[in-house]
Amino acid sequence: MILTRLAAALRVKRCIAAMVTAMAALIALPASAQTEDNWKPETFTLANGLTAVVLPDHRAPVVTHMLWYRVGSADEVKGKSGLAHFLEHLMFKATDDIPAGEFSKIVARNGGQDNAATSYDYTTYHFRIAKDRLPQMMRMEADRMVHLKLDEQEVIPELSVVREERRQTVESSPAAILDEMVSAQIYAGHPYAIPIIGHMDELAKLTRDDAVDWYRTWYGPENAILVVAGDITAAELKPLAENIYGAVPRRGDLKARKWPPVQALAKSVELSHADPKVSQASWSRTWLGVAMGDGDAEALQVGMEILGGGRVSRLYRELNEQGRATMSSGYSMEMEARGIVAISATPAPGVSVAAIEAEAMAVTSKFLREGPTAQELSRAKKMIAASAVFTRDNQMSLAEWYGERLTAGQTVAQIEGWEDRIRAVTAADVMRTMNRYLVGTNYVDAVLLPEAK
């Protein structure tokens, strides 16, 4: 599975939409289930360098186990795009003890679910399983960390699978094609400009040796972070981890990441893509945002929540409620090197793309001049803080929240302090950050159009 910029943004929207339900569910829990021990992180590090974070949640005898490798598509060398995601696929092939294709079947026979994901910054593998089956799953995960068999007859056919995935998820999706075009411009000269799934011509040239080299270079305990959420404590997990993961030797000298800095655009870029599958035109504007953990992150998040975060946002009130747009949104997304800020709108029938762009930017410019009202600021901070309740109420979401930030170099203390930083955001903070990132000409405009008949 690949985590594109578009997919990540949609996931943010789904989380916010579901948080009210999650809050109600949490409030309804009996006091015995809402103990202070739930979700309080505990950490330890093994002698071979593997770092572990435990997020206890004792409401049910299940655990979510996520192993994160601090390597993603941004670490690929020129001409080898898609290699990180390709190896993700191959990690489900054979080891010395597990036949090819049996890994997920064994997880399923034990009542669990498993999956994996590749981003620019990391690759992660997870399973959700009953607590008493955890040791077996950990042994399987440790086995493929060091004993993966990359036979030619297994590797080469998988390239066809990955290429077909690109056809289905990107080349058959006009929005995904335009999303790749935007990334190529906003991140020009940086590895983020290259699609995570890779370019089709470069995928065709990947080899078994490429996969083996990638595996041996990056897949070691010293480059891994283990996040386990669920009915377990560090006192229970640590002996298991020491016995199972502790037996995995270090790979040796780990390559240092060599990413060039993300450079702001010298001038704005206008993109468009037309396709017969598009039924309604849409417009978006994307700016460079902040890196994961940047000091401006929380204020920018609050500002974008006010501008385009939902049915009480300024864009929604001024565009949707006035019949000018059928959809509008705004969000800030952090990534390790540097994230993005974007607004978008789909014009209502009879409204042109040029008109909706002008109106959306008029709303944005007014917000940049005036700043938030006290009511808007308070409501946005409450909405964002409430999303943490949704995150904590779901083992997978919680493990993802920690894993994404830990692989970007944040500490547990920094992650835990996020809610306090949101609450501390002032109107002046919002004004300062919004006027820092949403001004000037360093943006990409993108228009998705129905193909002319």
Predicted region positions:
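Bacterial N-terminal signal peptides
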Residues: 13-28
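M16/insulysin-pitrilysin zinc metalloprotease superfamily fold
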Residues: 93-97, 128-159, 238, 333-391
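Short pre-active-site segment immediately N-terminal to the catalytic Zn-binding motif
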Residues: 72-80
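Active-site SXXK
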Residues: 81-95
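Non-catalytic accessory/assembly modules
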Residues: 153-157, 173-180, 387, 407, ...
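N-terminal secretory signal peptides that target proteins for export/translocation
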Residues: 1-12
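Non-catalytic beta-strand/loop surface segments
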Residues: 32-73, 99-132, 169-222, 247-294, ...
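Non-catalytic, conformational "gating/processing" segments within enzyme and secreted inhibitor domains
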Residues: 152, 159, 180, 212-244, ...
